[in-house]
Amino acid sequence: MAEVIIELKSVERHYVQGPRKLTILNGADFSLKRGEMVALVAPSGTGKSTLLHTAGLLERPDAGDVILAGRACGRLSDDERTAIRRNDVGFVYQFHHLLPEFSALENIMMPQLIKGLPRKEAAERAAQLLDYMQIGKRASHRPSELSGGEQQRVAIARAVANAPLVLLADEPTGNLDPVTASYVFEALGALVKQSGLAALIATHNHELASRMDRRVTLADGKVVPL
């Protein structure tokens, strides 16, 4: 049986708007196993981003806990959560957020350098990832010189540069045409399987969702299977 990498246990997340308290996550339970790619398919406004941010330790649960690699993270200090997030969690968004003044290679090197990896090793790792994503020849190009699909491939490579345990993606193909989206999805899926990541992918694309290991949605603040 595959190892459980991340688990949400009875997670609650509330926001206060004026006199009202909005409950976004209400006792949410969810887990991801190593090498598993799960689609999160839910309408806008139901809490997809909140779920991703809570799972990725960007937001702290109001109740319940997030267990990452066997470690309870919900009540850790901000510094401890930041360190775990940098080491163990990768994020990909609909818009790539690549640094425009740096090349594709340098963008992928950046998180490794921040972690303290020597520049030569970071460059070698970045080049390997670009080759794996089939855009090695574009290593010296800046984001503005890349197509939308190429930009997202660089963003995915950057997200996994530090070999995280978990990849969380919020509409990673939402800004791409269907053909390009399919190519990017295939590259992402191959990377997940090859590296043994656990991946949660929020998407409105039902065709891509059907190609993942399983699908879940959000209903009344809970994670339920589709």
From Swiss-Prot:
Binding site for ATP: A42, P43, S44, G45, T46, G47, K48, S49
Single Gene Ontology BP annotation: lipoprotein localization to outer membrane
Principal location class: membrane
EC number: 7.6.2.-
Membrane topology recorded in Swiss-Prot or TrEMBL: Peripheral membrane protein
Pfam families given in the database record: ABC_tran (PF00005)
Entry annotated with the keyword Membrane: yes
SUPFAM superfamilies to which the protein is assigned, alphabetical: P-loop containing nucleoside triphosphate hydrolases
Keywords: ATP-binding, Cell inner membrane, Cell membrane, Membrane, Nucleotide-binding, Translocase, Transport
UniProt function note: Part of the ABC transporter complex LolCDE involved in the translocation of mature outer membrane-directed lipoproteins, from the inner membrane to the periplasmic chaperone, LolA. Responsible for the formation of the LolA-lipoprotein complex in an ATP-dependent manner.
Protein name as catalogued: Lipoprotein-releasing system ATP-binding protein LolD
Species: Mesorhizobium japonicum (strain LMG 29417 / CECT 9101 / MAFF 303099)
